[in-house]
A protein has these predicted regions:
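Canonical RRM/RBD RNA-binding surface and closely related RRM-like beta-sheet modules
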Residues: 1-41, 49-74
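Catalytic "initiation/cleavage/transfer" segments centered on a nucleophilic residue
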Residues: 13, 51-113
Length: 113
């Protein structure tokens, strides 16, 4: 789980940061949106295909300032999410109303290999 994301950052911007070094490393990504404010909720979920990659991702991003404009002094934090594992995550979100949204930019990204 990625925390303390600046609220104005959108899915595309966050994925650019992640994809610099981890473009093929994950199979699930979701940046929840506050539809009333039209901003992200400040956190995102990512599932890595390999647990080994989490260590590198953690060392690269944990406690680092966001490398994006207008982020002030916000620092990136990482933690484990309540739901773990690709299958469990997919089962959880397939029941979610977010999957009924028309705009793909607000839905979770699920990558099937």
């Amino acid at each position: 789980m990625i925390k303390n994301i600046p609220s104005h950052v959108n899915q595309v911007e966050l994925l650019k940061i992640i994809s610099k070094n981890y473009s093929k490393a994950y199979n699930f990504f979701y940046l929840p949106i506050d539809f009333n404010k039209k901003l992200n909720a400040g956190y995102a979920f990512i599932n890595f295909k390999s647990a080994k990659l989490i260590i590198n991702f953690f060392l690269e991003l944990e406690n680092q300032p966001w490398d994006l404009p207008n982020c002030g002094n916000k620092i990136c934090y990482l933690s484990y999410a309540r739901i773990q594992g690709f299958r469990s995550i997919c089962e959880h979100f397939e029941k979610s109303n977010i999957m009924k949204q028309i705009d793909d930019k607000v839905k979770p990204i699920i990558i099937l290999d």
